[in-house]
């Protein structure tokens, strides 16, 4: 057995199965397409489910892939052990009703013994206890020693996940120190002790499990295999853990270099080193697939990984942001198989750095708060942190609850998760595990996706808005029907159509379907998972039946407006690259007949000057009346010509390229104007951030742009009338009014201070003494926080010894301040505790130091009640 690098193993595997007539497909995105059962792709076969279930026709009956995967179900074990990781690559070869056991078993043996040259006396095979067919093939079609084959039960060697396709499996294992194993019991024991490790699972999908629990034989059985690349690399490189594999160790070494720590010298530091090494791999690949840090879904998974890694960097003594620098090592070791990493290198680094900086801004304050909570819990001899406090750390300081749990676990403290989840409300969906579905293999198994794959629905709408066709499918009330009549709503599928189905951010067409005896309104148009065009209709008159001849007619005015907005989106994209920078990449868009929305990568607000320049460029290109051309070409040719591709899309070999003169060239399947001049006019109406590193521009075109400008002009005219000036004088008039208003506000504030000063004497005259401590408390009217603090300072200084607590109702909000002299603090007075109790009554909260604290409240009606509690609280604190 010769040592092989991880990248070499991957290439040898894919090449081997290409030689067996398999189509090599690139890894799919980590973001699942048309699969609500998963947050992230977590297995090699996951993106291929539509092929296994018959919802889509595979590009070839034999396929091989190396799929990037992320699993976070056992993230708490990552780092603590050297076996667990969140990111891994799964090599696989798949048969969709083509070859079966008699082919894959000899191929598997050939690959591991002749290509990888694994010693046969180190290999073991397991089969399902009843699978005599597999045993016969292993014994008679390979030269494996029959004594090294063991039958195991359903738990070990039968693959199923809920209902649907399932079947027995055969696993291949490597001996890592078990010695000779003679029985299945000895084999299981050695496996549990990691002395024998499984590295390849051959799944024979030959049954379909129904709701009654019956296993029905499939007419066309499938093959689904999975070999973990990193695990295979540990065997081929004779290392004990994935962290010692060549490409991963390169990252680990960089972590050690940045931190000054040495691996395998300190158990606690080793945990942090492994966590960072693993997480940066997941982080890099997730961002390359368009995922951005957020507080929900897969974005939350990313944020959790990133902040967990950043926190462990601080544990290692790394003071500055550092994760973005590790990305280079990940990319250098992976880009040949994942070229998108190199293409998006700078973007990935910017997203990571921005999120690190945001976490840096809050982590120190958050850790201080958490340490205070830990002390409080321990001082009270408790073992649980309340859910509301854990939520405050999450909401205010950006601490993922799992990070808080991890830190608390080190202190022997847990979280009140029920209380935390109650606080979370709308953010209940966590990243601990993917959403569960009963039917794993058929998560999109709706009636719309059961349309016969042999029915073709050709789109003719690029150059036609009206076509004749026949009705191929009718669906009503989630059932296939022979017909529909007036008043019914459902779905009609025809053999050809001019209707554009919603896709690529462009809304679906509307219009009518009719003949002499019926008429239906098309209210929406979408595609099912296999690409069939679905016309969502309401029958206005008559009846329609299968195979009826019909005419399909698109709403022309609406389609034309959509075309204008879609072409304008392309020009906008090119203009943004020109003005803002070539780092700009589309991360989403939405185009309908009213407006367009364009999301793009950028790390700060686009300035007013930049927006003006972008708008100017777009309108200039519109006025040039450039020809808009479309051409179908090879994907590589399109890229060579500089055509822009969407961030995370997978494209076929032949793609449609849309060009607007020499200014814009993009891969696009949408509908467009034939000449940029048809857009007429372009106007940006808003620019805002929608996520970390993502900005959004909304704009209108043609008559909608004119309406927008008219509306703005009318506002100017009305404002000029109110201020009794003409429009040219409006700015000067407004500036004058603002200056006057500021002067009046200063006068008002001065009067309020006078009133507050007048209240000072009254408060000093009403000082009470509690357990030897002077207490001054009062509610004062309508003064802001600064004035309230000034008044508190004066009263405290005047008292020389004591505590003062003041509250104010200012513009509908309640403000509190508490101050104490040093001698009263020594007696037990704590302003932070006083203010917290008092503010709670007014629906607020806050805290602070023993000698000074402030807070806010939500209910002005409770201000007097809150102030009345001051004496009771002080009495409870004074020793």
From Swiss-Prot:
Assign the protein's first listed, main location to one coarse class.
Answer: cytoplasm
EC no.? Answer: 6.1.1.7
Q: What class of enzyme is it?
A: ligase
Keyword tRNA-binding assigned to the entry: answer is yes
How the cofactor is bound: the record states: Binds 1 zinc ion per subunit.
Q: Which InterPro entries match?
A: aa-tRNA-synth_II/BPL/LPL, Ala-tRNA-lgiase_IIc, Ala-tRNA-ligase_IIc_anticod-bd, Ala-tRNA-synth_IIc_core, Ala-tRNA-synth_IIc_N, Ala-tRNA_ligase, Ala_tRNA_ligase_euk/bac, DHHA1_dom
The Gene Ontology biological process terms listed for this entry are: alanyl-tRNA aminoacylation
A Gene Ontology molecular function term for this protein is:
tRNA binding
GO cellular component annotations, sorted alphabetically?
Answer: cytosol
Domain comment from the record reads as follows: Consists of three domains; the N-terminal catalytic domain, the editing domain and the C-terminal C-Ala domain. The editing domain removes incorrectly charged amino acids, while the C-Ala domain, along with tRNA(Ala), serves as a bridge to cooperatively bring together the editing and aminoacylation centers thus stimulating deacylation of misacylated tRNAs.
Biological role stated in the UniProt entry: Catalyzes the attachment of alanine to tRNA(Ala) in a two-step reaction: alanine is first activated by ATP to form Ala-AMP and then transferred to the acceptor end of tRNA(Ala). Also edits incorrectly charged Ser-tRNA(Ala) and Gly-tRNA(Ala) via its editing domain.
User: What is the protein named?
Assistant: Alanine--tRNA ligase
Q: What lineage is on file? A: Bacteria, Bacillati, Bacillota, Clostridia, Eubacteriales
